[in-house]
């Protein structure tokens, strides 16, 4: 929701919502995928949980990524296909595809749209949120959700730019919400044009262009 982990107000809000001490939330930004190689080499990372990505195929240094993943003590993959990355995993958690679950996606124009499942899950695959909730509960932080709408409502309650992106707006055919959308009024579908009037969110209000 575009809120910095270093923002005291944001940290306090999330800690209260999640029922955890504020000091339990990290004060620094997390690692990036491109940091993984040297972090494993330096012994700072021993386990990696890969979700819905195929970095062996998508990262520029495929051989380097393969070497990094092979040197982990524990490598977990959560995906819908047997990819070049999942072939290296110690544990594979089979997830549902988009046609087997419902939820919300974000388009490149900032539009949130709801989609329904077309068919029930096959075999042993489970919804992503069910896997995460079950794993979290087993690790000591109970997550008791019944459906994706409950999770979505938690998300928008914590993110000011998304607060008006309700299922009520998105569920009807053709329904959508385009963030920032700060009103729950069913007729308010958000902001079609960002930075109207030429005002940007930089310190001087002007666009910063880089060549």
Regions found by a protein language model. Give the residues of each.
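Non-catalytic alpha/beta scaffold blocks inside enzyme catalytic domains
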Residues: 1-162
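Long, low-complexity segments enriched in small/aliphatic residues
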Residues: 1, 13-21, 152-211
């Amino acid at each position: 929701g575009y809120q910095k982990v270093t923002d005291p107000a944001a940290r306090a809000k999330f800690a209260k919502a999640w029922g955890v001490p504020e000091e339990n939330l990290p004060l620094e930004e997390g690692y990036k995928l491109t940091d993984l190689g040297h972090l494993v080499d330096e012994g700072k990372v021993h386990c990696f949980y890969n979700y819905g990505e195929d970095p062996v195929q998508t990262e520029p240094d495929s051989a380097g990524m393969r070497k990094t993943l092979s040197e982990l003590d524990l490598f977990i993959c959560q995906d819908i296909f047997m990819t070049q990355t999942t072939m290296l995993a110690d544990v594979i958690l089979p997830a549902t595809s988009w046609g087997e679950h419902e939820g919300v996606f974000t388009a490149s124009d900032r539009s949130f749209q709801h989609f329904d499942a077309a068919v029930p899950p096959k075999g042993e695959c489970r919804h992503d949120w069910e896997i995460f909730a079950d794993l979290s509960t087993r690790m000591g932080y109970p997550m008791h959700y019944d459906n994706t709408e409950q999770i979505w409502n938690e998300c928008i309650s914590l993110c000011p730019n998304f607060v008006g992106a309700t299922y009520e707006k998105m569920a009807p055919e053709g329904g959508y919400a385009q963030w920032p959308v700060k009103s729950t009024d069913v007729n308010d579908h958000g902001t079609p044009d960002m930075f109207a009037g030429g005002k940007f969110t930089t310190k001087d209000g002007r666009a910063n262009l880089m060549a």
